[in-house]
């Protein structure tokens, strides 16, 4: 079982925790992570793009000039895609980009993402993370104590408005509840800061 240190908000190691081999010690499957990230990004697309074909552009029903005898190129409509103001060839239309992938693949991808953070020493476990009131300065100091100077995702076991509001004002820092974590966010941020109770909940669900 992978073993990592547990820190307090002052950056001091207070104990150690043995992580579940089935969650934080699996063989990293990069293809599964790729498929899930691609799926997440596709599902986020609005798909509202739209343009008109030559049949949908208003006007252009009359032939601009006669077919022969003018010396000019033959034209059937001023709404031809070749003309300014004409229709669009294969014009994009609103569509739904979302699709589903097997639950087994999603679980494997999440475990792979968590394991990759452990393998690259980018996982920080906190004994607890509590703030009496929203204070950005206090959150900045906590990150400084943990030597976090890059993008970080903070995962909590229980919702804390004080923590969320304190982190919202810090560029490159995002908070998430343990039941909302996903592969894209885990890989997007350089550091994964997770509370001890959140680790236990992750292992309960995915072990």
Swiss-Prot record:
Residues 60-71 have a biased composition (Basic residues). GO terms for biological process: translation. One of its GO terms (molecular function) is rRNA binding. Keywords: Ribonucleoprotein, Ribosomal protein, RNA-binding, rRNA-binding. Coiled coil: none annotated. Signal peptide: none annotated. The keyword Oxidoreductase does not apply. GO terms for cellular component: ribonucleoprotein complex; ribosome. InterPro entries: Ribosomal_uL4, Ribosomal_uL4-like, Ribosomal_uL4_dom_sf. The keyword Lyase does not apply. It comes from the Bacteria. Residues 44-71 are annotated as: Disordered. Belongs to the universal ribosomal protein uL4 family. One of the primary rRNA binding proteins, this protein initially binds near the 5'-end of the 23S rRNA. It is important during the early stages of 50S assembly. It makes multiple contacts with different domains of the 23S rRNA in the assembled 50S subunit and ribosome. Forms part of the polypeptide exit tunnel. NCBIfam families: rplD_bact. This is Large ribosomal subunit protein uL4. It comes from Alkaliphilus oremlandii (strain OhILAs). The lineage of its organism: Bacteria, Bacillati, Bacillota, Clostridia, Peptostreptococcales.
